[in-house]
């Protein structure tokens, strides 16, 4: 029988040191701003690889933390719903916003992006934590699954 220590199941979440409500992330524009101001400043951020982040939101849609849920290659990144929602459950989040970049600079979603968005939305419905949006960030543009009517 394998024994697991408490640290085995540790979830690493970057808690924000800001006053709750000081930043609201309720549309694609504010989500893209969050990516540019917070995520690209992280020491682990690499613009040459697809990176996927889950942003946990409170009931006022203000970020309370974020966590890196996937690091990929130049053109793909594997993300699993359990990794996205593990942090959301740990932080008692009301909703989750998923954001990832396309190093190519294009923000159009791939078929894999569409599939994971549907899986994340389904998982969120089951555990009653909203998937607010899935945003793909390109060089000068972004694609919002919510604004496209998919969510």
Residue map of PLM features:
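N-terminal beta-strand/alpha-helix entry module and adjacent surface
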Residues: 1-91, 114-130, 141-151
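Short beta-strands and strand-loop turn motifs
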Residues: 96-102
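Short, solvent-exposed loop/turn segments at secondary-structure junctions
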Residues: 104-108
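A glycine-rich phosphate/pyrophosphate-binding beta-strand-loop-alpha-helix module
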Residues: 109-113
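Beta-strand-loop-alpha "switch" segments that mediate conformational coupling across diverse proteins
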Residues: 133
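Nucleic-acid nuclease catalytic cores
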Residues: 136-138
């Amino acid at each position: 029988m394998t024994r697991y220590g408490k640290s085995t199941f540790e979830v690493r979440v970057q808690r924000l040191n800001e006053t709750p409500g000081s930043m609201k992330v309720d549309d694609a524009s504010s989500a893209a701003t969050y990516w540019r101001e917070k995520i690209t400043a992280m020491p682990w951020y690499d613009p040459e690889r697809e990176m996927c982040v889950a942003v946990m939101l409170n009931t006022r849609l203000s970020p309370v933390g974020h966590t890196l849920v996937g690091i990929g290659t130049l053109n793909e990144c594997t993300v699993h719903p359990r990794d996205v929602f593990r942090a959301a459950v740990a932080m008692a989040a009301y909703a989750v916003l998923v954001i990832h970049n396309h190093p190519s600079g294009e923000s159009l979603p791939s078929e894999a992006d569409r599939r994971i968005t549907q899986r994340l939305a389904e998982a969120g419905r089951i555990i009653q934590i909203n998937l607010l949006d899935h945003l793909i960030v390109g060089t000068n543009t972004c694609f919002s699954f919510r604004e496209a009517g998919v969510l």
